[in-house]
C-alpha cells in the first residue's frame, strides 16, 4: 500500500499571494474587533494592577555608577560562614572551576578571570568580629555558608546584621553538609525550613544553593558549575558609601624600610607599600588621606599605577565566543599561586623542572618559535662575544665594517633617536587600513633598533626567513613559514616610500608636552624642535633613500645641516603663516565672537569652517607647508575683499540694529514655547527614565572631558580611576603592623574625604538590637563601626522632650529609638553604623549576641544641648498669707540671685515664684504663692542641667596585635571591679530605706453649743464625751454558783457536738456533689459521642442519597419520593 504524502502549504505563486493579501489587516486583532474585547472587567483590573505592581517593584532611586566600563575592577566575592562549614573547600572548587588551578592553602585574596569583561576576587572572611566588619564594607557579593545539619549559627546572624547598616550587598546562601542526612524526607524538611528562615532574614525569593558531600577535596563539579554561572551573571547596584569613596583590598604588602634604620631602632616607623585593585571613586595621586581599618589614619607618600597582573580578556579587542585556556588567568601573590609565594620577610619562587615543549599540534607563533630555538642552543648567550653578525645562512660572520671617512663624518648622535622600531608594523597596518596611533604609543621605548640613515635597507626584497619574521606579526601574516614567493607580496612594494611617509606623519601626531618640557636632557632649542616636529622633519630631509635593489644595508650620506639654520627657517615660515592667518576674515570673525559683542551664530559657523584646519588635535602643524600653501594663497587673495566687507559691516545704522534685536527676541520666544510644549516623542517618558537618561548624559560628558589627555596628565588631574592596579606607599606605619602581619586577615585601604578628617560630636539615631541581652547605659564605652573606621567612644543617650530639649536618658529604651551623642570622626549624615561592646572572641564564648545597637548618623557638630533634670527642694519657716520664707533650697545668696523669677510649687500643687534673698549666709529667700501654704508643705524647683559629652575616641588597632582576635579597649567599670575583686561602693543617699512618717495629731473640733443647737440632727457631733467614772455594771463582777457552772458546761459540750456533726455532714455532702459531677461529665461525654456518631451517619446517608439523586437526574430518569 502506498504511503500518503503530507500536505505542504504553498509559499509562492498566485494562490500564495492571494492568501498573503487576505492576512493583511488594518492593525486590529482580527477582522471582528468586538470578538476580542474585554470579557471580564474584574480580570482586566486585576491584570492592570499586577502589571503596575511589577513595574513599581522594579523602580529604585537612580544612582550614578562611577565604575568605568572599559576596565572595571574585579568583583569582590566574600565567602563567610561559621567554622567547619566549608569556606576553604568552596573557594578551592570555584578557583578550580575558573582557572583549572588547584590551591593547597588560601591566604589572602585570589583574583581569577571569570568572563570576557569580569574578574572575581575571592576572599575568605575570618570569624572574628573585626574582620567581618571590614569585609562587609567592601564585599560586592557574599556567599553565606550554612551548615544544613546544624542550622543557623550565631556568626551568621551577626554578619547579616553587620551587612544591613553598611549597604547590604548581594547575598547568596549556600547549604553544605547535606550528605549527613540519612533520610530523604528529613533532608527535604531541613531544606524547606532553612530556606524559609533564610528568606525571613533577607527577602522572599533569596537565592539558596545546595552543596552535597566533598569528592576528592572539592564539591561536585556540576553544583560548582551552577553556582559559578550565577556568580558570573550577577548584577550589582552601586552602594552609597562605596560610590563616594575610593578603596582597595590589598593583595600584597612589602616593607621598604632601610635595614640600617631597623637595626638602629627596631620600633622605628616603617615605610610600606600596598598593592591592589582600586574600587569606588578616583584616588588622588598626591597626598591622599586614607584609613586602614585596624591600623589608623595615614597620608599616602606616593601612588602609582602598575601593569595589570590579571588583565581582562577583552583588552586585546578580539571578539571571542569563549575564553581560551591561556586567558583563564589567576593572581594571588599571598598564596602559593604561579610559583611565587610572598612571606613576611622573604619571597619563595618555585622553578618548574619541565621545559617548554615544542611538540605541539597547534601552529606556534613568533614568541613560541623563539623559545624553541633558545632551547636548542648549545652555548649560553654572551659566551662568544666575537662571533659577529651573520646576514645569511651560507655567508660568513661580519666582525667590522669599513667606512669611508670622506663619505661619513662620524661625530656621534647629536639629536635624540626617534622611536622608529615599529616602522615595519606601522607600514603593515597602514597597508591593511588599520593604522592607529594607539599602536605607536604602545611601542617599546627601550628597543635598540635605529633606522637613521638606513632607509634604503628597508627596500630590499631578498627572500630570507629572518627578514620574514622581522616584518610579520604572526604566521597568518606570513602566509606560511617556507614561502618562496615573497617577491609577489603586496606589502613589500614601495617600502622606502612608506617609511618616508611614516616619518613625515610622525610629526603630525600629538606629543606629550609635559614630558618634552621637563626633560632635562634636551636643550631649549631641541625641546622646541621636538615639539614642532623638527627632529622628524630634519631626519626625513637628512635621509637619502636608495632605490638600488642590488645593494643591501647600503650606507647613505648624511646631510650636515646645522640645527640653528633649520630653526631660523622654521621661525621665518611660522611668522609668515601667522601673519597670513591674522588676515583671514573667518578667523577674525571667530575671534570677535569670543567677546560680548560677538554673535553666537557667527561663532558656530566660524567653528564649523575652521574646524577642518585642526583635525590633528589642539596643536598646529607648522611644518606641513606644502599642503597648506594653496589654501593660504586663496586666503590671501580674498583678504582684501573681506576687509572691505568688514568695514562696511561696522557702519550699521540704528534701524538695522533694532531689526536684529527683534529677530533675537522672536527666536527666544519660539524657544520658550518649544520648551513649554515639550518633545512629543518624550511625552510618555516618566521621571525615573528621565533621571536615568540625565545621569547617562552626565557620565558621557565627564568621560569625554578627559579622553584627549594622556594617562599621566589625567592621573594628575582626576587621580587614578577604579580598576587600576595601584601601588601605594605609606610612611610612618607602626612597626607592629609589619612584625605581626598575617595575610589571612583582610587589609583594606579606604579613602577619606576632607570633612571626614575632622573630629567632633556626632549625633546619631540609635536603637538597641532586640537580640542583645542587656540594655545600654549612658557613659559605658561602645565600639562603633562608622565609615571606614572602627573606634571606641563614650555615648550619651537622650530623647526629645516635647521637641523643646534633648533630655538625657540613663539607659536606652527597650523597643524604640533614641538619640546618642559621642565624640568621634565626622561622617556624612544618613550614614549607617553598628555598635558592639567588644570585638574580642573571648566575649563571644558566653554565646550571646554581640551586635549591641544599630542606627544612622543625624548631625555633626562641635557642641551639644543635652540636659538632665535637676529638682531642688526646700521647706518654709515663715508664712504670711501668700508670702512664705523658704530655706534649705540654696546655699548662698548668689544661687538665689541666679534663680530669681523661677517657678516653684508645692507638693499639693500650689504654684509660686522666687523673689529675693533675705539672708546673706544660708541662702534663704522670699517667695510668693497663689494661695497660702502650710508649714508642712514641701516646696521644690524643677531645673535642667547641661550634660557634657566626654571627649574620648580611640581606634581599634587589632592588626597591630599578635592575636588579631583579642583586642581590648576601655573596659566597663563592673569588669574592672570583677577582675580586681572589689565590691560596688554603696552611697548612703543612694540606698533604699523604709519611709517612717510621724503620726499627726489633730486637735478636737469644738463647736459652740448655740451653733450646735441650730444644726440638724444628722449634722450634730456623734462622738460622746467619755465617762470619767465606770458604770454600775462595770464596777461589779458576776460570780456563778455550782448549778450555773454545770448548765454552762453542758451547753458548751452540746454546741461542740453540734459543730462536729455539721462539719461531717458538710464533708459528706461535698463528696456526694463531687461524685455527682463526675457522673454527669461521663454522661455528657457519652451524649456528645452519640450525637457525633448520629450526625456522621446522617451526613453519610444524606450524601449517598444526594449522589443517587444526581445520578438519576443525569441519566434522565425522575426519582421517586
Curated annotation (Swiss-Prot):
Q: Which Pfam families match?
A: AARP2CN, RIBIOP_C
Q: Is Oxidoreductase included in the keywords of this UniProt record?
A: no
State where ATP binds.
81-88
Instruction: Indicate, by first and last residue, each region the UniProt record lists as having compositional bias (Acidic residues).
Output: 605-635, 644-654
Q: What is this protein called?
A: Ribosome biogenesis protein bms1
Modified residues annotated as Phosphoserine in this record = 438, 442, 464, 474, 476, 546
Q: Which residues does the annotated region (G4) include?
A: 176-179
List the residue ranges of the region (Disordered).
1-33, 603-665, 1060-1085, 1099-1121
Q: Its catalytic activity?
A: GTP + H2O = GDP + phosphate + H(+)
Q: Where in the cell is it found?
A: Nucleus, Nucleolus; Cytoplasm, Cytoskeleton, Spindle
Q: Which SUPFAM superfamilies match?
A: P-loop containing nucleoside triphosphate hydrolases
Q: Where is the composition biased (Low complexity)?
A: 1110-1121
Could you say which protein family the record assigns here?
Belongs to the TRAFAC class translation factor GTPase superfamily. Bms1-like GTPase family. BMS1 subfamily.
Q: Membrane spanning segments where?
A: none
Return one GO MF term. ATP binding
Comp. bias regions, Basic residues: 7-22
Q: Which stretches does the entry tag as region G1?
A: 81-88
Q: Where is this region: G3?
A: 124-127
InterPro entries xrefs: AARP2CN (IPR012948), Bms1/Tsr1 (IPR039761), Bms1_N (IPR037875), BMS1_TSR1_C (IPR007034), G_Bms1/Tsr1_dom (IPR030387), P-loop_NTPase (IPR027417)
- Region annotation (G2) maps to 109-113
SMART domains the record matches: AARP2CN, DUF663
Quaternary state and partners of this protein? Answer: Interacts directly with rcl1 and the U3 snoRNA to form a stable subcomplex. Component of the 90S small subunit processome also known as 90S pre-ribosome that consists of the 35S pre-rRNA, early-associating ribosomal proteins most of which are part of the small ribosomal subunit, the U3 snoRNA and associated proteins.
Organism source for this protein? Schizosaccharomyces pombe (strain 972 / ATCC 24843)
Q: Predominant location of this chain?
A: nucleus
GO BP term, example:
maturation of SSU-rRNA from tricistronic rRNA transcript (SSU-rRNA, 5.8S rRNA, LSU-rRNA)
| Lineage, opening ranks | Eukaryota, Fungi, Dikarya, Ascomycota, Taphrinomycotina
